[in-house]
């Protein structure tokens, strides 16, 4: 699982404000194909790992996969049937906060139809709606702007 090596504060506040669209990480930079989120939400480290395994399994370990998000926000939970008070709960998992337009995964070294199917299967593992994009389609879209 992905998680930060070291944090300044062990149990910070929950990520709340997920308004607006992604400014950073919104273009396909490394590969030729990408998976872009269409809505805001949290993606856990387990969901990222599940999607990564799905992609690598479908492309039969051919090509290269880039994970463009990192789960850096800890989410705490208290044990079940615990009374109120007695401090904040322990860290249960880490999430990446996603805004619409954020590139989640990139893929290179495989044909477009294989990449599209692999990223479609990966999108089914994620809690946000996603779409398939290519580097060429993004360049055309940015010039029209």
From Swiss-Prot:
Supply the alphabetized keyword list.
Ribonucleoprotein, Ribosomal protein, RNA-binding, rRNA-binding, tRNA-binding
State the Pfam families in the record.
Answer: Ribosomal_L16
Record-linked CDD domains: Ribosomal_L16_L10e
InterPro entries, alphabetized? Ribosomal_uL16 (IPR047873), Ribosomal_uL16_bact-type (IPR000114), Ribosomal_uL16_CS (IPR020798), Ribosomal_uL16_dom (IPR016180), Ribosomal_uL16_sf (IPR036920)
GO MF terms listed in the record are: rRNA binding; structural constituent of ribosome; tRNA binding
Q: Which GO terms describe its cellular component?
A: cytosolic large ribosomal subunit
Please indicate which superkingdom the organism of origin belongs to: Bacteria
Q: What processes does the entry annotate via GO biological process terms?
A: translation
The Swiss-Prot or TrEMBL record describes its family as follows: Belongs to the universal ribosomal protein uL16 family.
What this chain does, per the entry, is described as: Binds 23S rRNA and is also seen to make contacts with the A and possibly P site tRNAs.
Q: What quaternary structure, including any partners, is listed in this protein's UniProt entry?
A: Part of the 50S ribosomal subunit.
NCBIfam families xrefs: rplP_bact (TIGR01164)
The name this protein goes by in its record:
Large ribosomal subunit protein uL16
Species name for this entry? Herpetosiphon aurantiacus (strain ATCC 23779 / DSM 785 / 114-95)
Q: Which gene encodes it?
A: rplP
């Amino acid at each position: 699982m992905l998680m930060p090596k070291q944090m300044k504060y062990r149990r910070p506040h929950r990520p709340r404000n997920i308004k607006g669209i992604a400014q950073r990480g919104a273009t396909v930079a490394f590969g030729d194909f990408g998976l872009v989120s269409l809505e805001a939400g949290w993606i856990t480290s387990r969901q990222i790992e599940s999607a990564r395994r799905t992609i690598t399994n479908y492309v039969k370990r051919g090509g290269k996969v880039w994970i463009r998000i990192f789960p850096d926000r800890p989410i705490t939970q208290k044990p079940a049937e615990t009374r109120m008070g007695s401090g904040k709960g322990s860290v249960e998992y880490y999430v990446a906060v996603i805004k619409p337009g954020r590139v989640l995964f990139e893929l290179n070294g495989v044909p477009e139809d294989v990449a599209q199917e692999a990223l479609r299967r990966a999108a089914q593992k994620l809690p946000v709606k996603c779409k398939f994009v290519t580097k060429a389609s993004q360049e055309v879209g940015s010039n029209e702007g």
